[in-house]
Amino acid sequence: MMNPLIIKLGGVLLDSEEALERLFSTLVNYRESHQRPLVIVHGGGCVVDELMKGLNLPVKKKNGLRVTPADQIDIITGALAGTANKTLLAWAKKHQIAAVGLFLGDGDSVKVTQLDEELGHVGLAQPGSPKLINSLLENGYLPVVSSIGVTDEGQLMNVNADQAATALAATLGADLILLSDVSGILDGKGQRIAEMTAAKAEQLIEQGIITDGMIVKVNAALDAARTLGRPVDIASWRHAEQLPALFNGMPMGTRILA
């Protein structure tokens, strides 16, 4: 089996039918013309935000990570492992793709521990066992994995989806693409940066050009590149025509180098 490719979906993609249609049409064509097994990892911050708003619950973030109190973890689990995950499975079904919905704890694929007590039910993701997902890939399934995990003590944890995708890529020896709303990392003039090293990232963070959630994304990508010993791409899902080339290793967004 070729080494798998993990496609991490994020941003408002889950809210856009047009974007999902484009993405899944591309996935169908790619799976027909390439032998490479694919895995989708997703968060769903916008789904969670809408739900929290509807329930009048405050959304708190610390250093770009969502604070998850004990009384909110069930709601967030429902949004990510439930609504967001099953929405993606429904799109797969619509496109005749045999998909399986999972969370990080299934088959112990990604190990999760509590990251920081102040963040509440927020998990740190580490590589786990590749057995379950490899067996699904060998049988032609598309695993769709939500970024909810569980600790050895049985506590549900909300994991940053970029970090969850990194841990799963390390588990499977997979390549990783982080798809988001932006076409990559932009410089101070709004131009896409083709390649990014840790030193360059630090410089742009210091200058205030990379901020908030993008800091988490860049750090996750740098961490992934270091952990995996290979470049990681941050790119946009908006240009569906570029996705097949991206999936085949052509740099289309910002390539993060270890």
UniProtKB/Swiss-Prot annotation:
Picking any one GO biological process from the record gives: arginine biosynthetic process via ornithine
Pathway of this protein? Amino-acid biosynthesis; L-arginine biosynthesis; N(2)-acetyl-L-ornithine from L-glutamate: step 2/4
Location(s) in or outside the cell: Cytoplasm
* Protein name from the UniProt record: Acetylglutamate kinase
SUBUNIT field: Homodimer.
What are the GO MF terms of this UniProt record? acetylglutamate kinase activity; ATP binding
Coarse class of the protein's main subcellular location: cytoplasm
Please list the residues that bind ATP: 181-186, 209-211
Function noted in UniProt? Catalyzes the ATP-dependent phosphorylation of N-acetyl-L-glutamate.
Record CDD domains: AAK_NAGK-NC (cd04249)
**So what family is this one in?**
Belongs to the acetylglutamate kinase family. ArgB subfamily.
EC code(s) of this entry: 2.7.2.8
Q: Return the annotated site residues (Transition state stabilizer).
A: 8, 217
Q: Does the entry feature the keyword ATP-binding, yes or no? A: yes
Task: Tell me which Pfam families the record gives.
Answer: AA_kinase
**Which keywords has UniProt assigned to this entry?**
Amino-acid biosynthesis, Arginine biosynthesis, ATP-binding, Cytoplasm, Kinase, Nucleotide-binding, Transferase
Instruction: Tell me the domain of life.
Output: Bacteria
* InterPro entries per the UniProt record, alphabetical: AceGlu_kinase-like_sf, AcgluKinase_fam, ArgB, Asp/Glu/Uridylate_kinase, NAGK-NC
GO cellular component, alphabetical, reads: cytoplasm
Q: What class of enzyme is it?
A: transferase
Which PANTHER family has this protein been placed in?
N-ACETYLGLUTAMATE SYNTHASE, N-ACETYLGLUTAMATE SYNTHASE, MITOCHONDRIAL
Identify the SUPFAM superfamilies for this entry: Carbamate kinase-like (SSF53633)
What residues does substrate bind to?
44-45, 66, 158
